[in-house]
Amino acid sequence: MSIVDNKKAFFDYFIEERFEAGLVLEGWEVKAIRAGRVHVKEAYVVIRKAELFLIGCHITPLLSASTHIVPDSTRTRKLLLNAIEIRKLIGKVEQKGYTLVPLNLHFTKGNVKCEIGLARGKKQHDKRAATKEREWEVQKGRIARGDLNA
């Protein structure tokens, strides 16, 4: 069950490969994610010392959060993957043109997981072509239904 999707990632990048990673979260963050108070649109993944981190993911704390903690809504969160997967990703990202982007957050067996994608950036003309293709699909659907004046 997907909590939040990063639609901008699919518009800006060609997704070559997908990986599911665990997240190191605090208790208030899990509660806020369950309530749907999370945004991954501006988030990205970096590699530091053979570890992956999610940066820029905004989790808005609940109003009922504890008073003895100070919630940091945009803190850096560690991603958990197998060592083999991390080495594979490091090798791919070191190639020119590849990056890691978060695609969505979802629950797997009660745990919050982040699906990250090995991505290659789209050029402006690729984005335009994708938009034209989407518009043509909508137009074909209208023609098939007989709704020509829309």
UniProtKB/Swiss-Prot annotation:
Any one Gene Ontology cellular component term annotated for this protein: cytosol
GO terms (BP aspect): trans-translation
This protein's record includes keyword Cytoplasm: yes
GO molecular function list: RNA binding
InterPro entries: SmpB (IPR023620), SsrA-bd_prot (IPR000037), SsrA-bd_prot_CS (IPR020081)
Compartment(s) of residence: Cytoplasm
Family: Belongs to the SmpB family.
Name the record gives this protein: SsrA-binding protein
Originating species: Polynucleobacter asymbioticus (strain DSM 18221 / CIP 109841 / QLW-P1DMWA-1)
